[in-house]
Every structure is written in C-alpha cells, then in structure tokens.
Amino acid sequence: MKVVKIGAIWCSGCLVMNSVISKTLKNYTIDFQEYDIDMDEAEAKSYQPGDVLPVFIVMDQDQEVTRFAGEYSYDEFVSKLKEVGVIHEEDH
C-alpha cells in the first residue's frame, strides 16, 4: 500500500503536517508520495483531492482504499494508518 499526500505551499495545515509526516517516515517504512496542487497540478488533480488540504489517499495497487483530510497529531496520524493496514505494529 502507499499513501499519497496532496497539499500546497500556501496550505497552513500542510505545513503543520510536514513535521508529523517526517516523524512518521523516520519511525515506519511507508511507500509515501507527495504532490503539490499547484506545482504538480496534473498528478494532484488525477486523485480528485477535493476542497480540504492536505488530503491523504491510501492506495492499494492503484485502487483507492480510503482518504482522510486535515491536520492530525502524530499519534492520530499513525493510528489512522494502522486502521487501514498501512502500518503494522511489527513495523515499528
């Protein structure tokens, strides 16, 4: 599975999430891709991100499993990724 983040430079929630994502990637091995809605417009829009940024889209072999948007604490973010099977306890 992979996690795709759609964000923007001007998005304050995206900036907040950068540190959460960085910490998550230090602690867990995750296939993670990130697109900027303005700089990577075609790629970002192909995921139909919606109106709330950042949006996190969990993909399994090019099929969307789930998505969630907004700001999360580190623990909330990790919990969401565990719920959908991106992170397993033994990965830590």
Listing of model-derived features with the role each one plays in the protein:
Residues Y47-I57:
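Structural micro-motif
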Residues L15, S19, A42, T66, ...:
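Alpha-helical elements of the RecA-like P-loop NTPase motor core of helicases
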Residues K5-A8, T29-A42:
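Thiol-based oxidoreductase modules, predominantly thioredoxin-like and allied folds used
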Residues M1-T24:
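Local sequence-structure signature of Cys/Sec-based thiol-disulfide redox active-site neighborhoods
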Residues I57-D91:
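Non-catalytic, surface beta->alpha helical segment in thiol-disulfide oxidoreductase systems
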Residues M1, E41-S46:
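A short beta-strand-turn-helix
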